Amino acid sequence: MSGLKAGDSFPSDVVFSYIPWSEDKGEITACGIPINYNASKEWADKKVILFALPGAFTPVCSARHVPEYIEKLPEIRAKGVDVVAVLAYNDAYVMSAWGKANQVTGDDILFLSDPDARFSKSIGWADEEGRTKRYALVIDHGKITYAALEPAKNHLEFSSAETVLKHL
């Protein structure tokens, strides 16, 4: 498959690895237990922003991409978005720690792992190194309403929170 586009259905059986945030595991050094997060099922009746990036704790991702979504979360929620999720090829432990490092609690933003970039590869949006590329999807009750892939690893425009907000 060569990407997703507006009007497509979100694929079935998309499962990510995820460690849900919990208060007793809120410290960055505390380890939770990864679960299989069936995005296809969980998001079937929700409005969702899924944004992907090349890796946790990397410069553009940590300095700009995730902080912008955190900052714009109230505006995003005001537009009726139920779920905001960030996706990278890193394992669930790294993604969980990254969420904690960004002081994200509860389910404000889900920090999901795309093991071996399976999902990103399946839609043609993984790089030659096997990492997730930088992209954004808006999914509304199982239908893609916005899909954008950045032209380069360090480019941040089409998948930014500011741009995605304009497409809600």
Swiss-Prot record:
The active site is at 61 (cysteine sulfenic acid (-soh) intermediate). Keywords: Allergen, Antioxidant, Disulfide bond, Oxidoreductase, Peroxidase, Redox-active center. GO terms for molecular function: IgE binding; protein homodimerization activity; thioredoxin peroxidase activity. Its EC number is 1.11.1.24. It is an enzyme of class 1 (oxidoreductase). Residues 4-158 form the Thioredoxin domain. The keyword S-adenosyl-L-methionine does not apply. Disruption phenotype: Renders cells sensitive to reactive oxygen species. Renders A.fumigatus avirulent in a mouse model of pulmonary aspergillosis. One of its GO terms (biological process) is cell redox homeostasis. InterPro entries: PRX5-like, Redoxin, Thioredoxin-like_sf, Thioredoxin_domain. CDD domains: PRX5_like (cd03013). GO terms for cellular component: cytoplasm; mitochondrion; peroxisome. The active site is a conserved redox-active cysteine residue, the peroxidatic cysteine (C(P)), which makes the nucleophilic attack on the peroxide substrate. The peroxide oxidizes the C(P)-SH to cysteine sulfenic acid (C(P)-SOH), which then reacts with another cysteine residue, the resolving cysteine (C(R)), to form a disulfide bridge. The disulfide is subsequently reduced by an appropriate electron donor to complete the catalytic cycle. In this typical 2-Cys Prx, C(R) is provided by the other dimeric subunit to form an intersubunit disulfide. Homodimer; disulfide-linked, upon oxidation. Belongs to the peroxiredoxin family. Prx5 subfamily. This is Peroxiredoxin Asp f3. It comes from Aspergillus fumigatus (strain ATCC MYA-4609 / CBS 101355 / FGSC A1100 / Af293). The lineage of its organism: Eukaryota, Fungi, Dikarya, Ascomycota, Pezizomycotina.
